[in-house]
Each structure stands twice: as C-alpha cells, then as structure tokens.
Amino acid sequence: MQTQEQSQKKKQKAVFGIYMDKDLKTRLKVYCAKNNLQLTQAIEEAIKEYLQKRNG
C-alpha cells in the first residue's frame, strides 16, 4: 500500500521546453489526434523507449 507522499511523488511533473522541427511537431500532433493521446503522453512514451533501448 502506498503512502500519500509516495503517490504524490509519482504524479509530480516538471516543465520541459524544447525547440523542435515544425514538421516533426505537426506529425506528432496529427498522430496524437488520430490516436487520442495527449502530446505529453506520446513524448514521455517516446523518451522512455529511447532510454530503454540505450540502457539509460
């Protein structure tokens, strides 16, 4: 059973601003719209996969 503090730590988010190619951003937005995803969800999943493949 998780404590309230552990649960809150899991939900903490940080702002992460980046510069991205406009075409790539458009493709990502279209993909998210078609797949009912938020941009944050898609980006987090992509980064997790990227790091997992590289033992990061």
From Swiss-Prot:
Pfam families: 56B_RHH. GO terms for biological process: regulation of DNA-templated transcription. It comes from Sulfolobus islandicus rod-shaped virus 1 (SIRV-1). InterPro entries: 56B_RHH (IPR049123), Arc_rbn_hlx_hlx (IPR013321), Ribbon_hlx_hlx (IPR010985). This is Uncharacterized protein 56B. It comes from the Viruses.
